[in-house]
């Protein structure tokens, strides 16, 4: 067998590292739920505070975030058991798949909320950049604008989920995140292969080659089928993660291919930007491997992952603006 070229070795490295970074966290299980002291604490709290004629009323700010007497008991017991384990020199355990974060004004994961908001703001900035830099006659402009809205929606639902974890907020977060991942795969071939006429055209002219519309239908059907399965057949965490990993791998391979081939053809340094973003995102996701107990009871590896993704949207939008210049000014060399 002939040895692999450096470019192919690079692609395989990114693929392997991405898979390890994503799937390794799935190997860890939450054990705090099964601790006898936690179960006994929750049971006693509910009996004494909730299953009574006049249950204790929660503060208004907790009620606004849909905290109930049983969920308050669960939170209080998490904090109590964790404090006792620290005092005894025992390890901190996760509860319901999460670390026992210190709640701030009813917000469960304050740092993840802050970083999710900042990510959403970056997509809003990208939206304004697209509106300002792309002429209306540039065919992909509408797709890029739609992508910015998808990104803002994804981080909005991430903010809601990290504010208050519940089945509805969790599923909205997962569905929106999956939509963003799949949309990123949808538009990657449009940037790489440019199946459109960049010169001004009449409204009756077809903006893109036919395969783009077919590709869009395939992505839409795949997304709707994915959501339908999770919502109405079985909400399978492993399947959901695997689906997102496969889609993410596909787009990462495409972007690495773009960076290598584009730079080889035109020797333009900015052609490496997508490849750099792939490396950055892969390393950022590897933060999940750390999965340490939260610093200050609030900052964990998952929150740091969200922090690491904050600059990525604007990096990508600035790349799209720079990449489109040759299209807009008629200097494009077809790949």
Task: Label each region the model flagged.
Residues 5-11, 142, 211:
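N-terminal membrane topogenic signal
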Residues 2-6, 335:
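C-terminal regulatory/interaction regions
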Residues 24-335:
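Multi-pass alpha-helical transmembrane bundles in non-GPCR membrane proteins
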Residues 8-29:
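Cleavable N-terminal signal peptides of Sec/SRP-targeted secreted and luminal proteins
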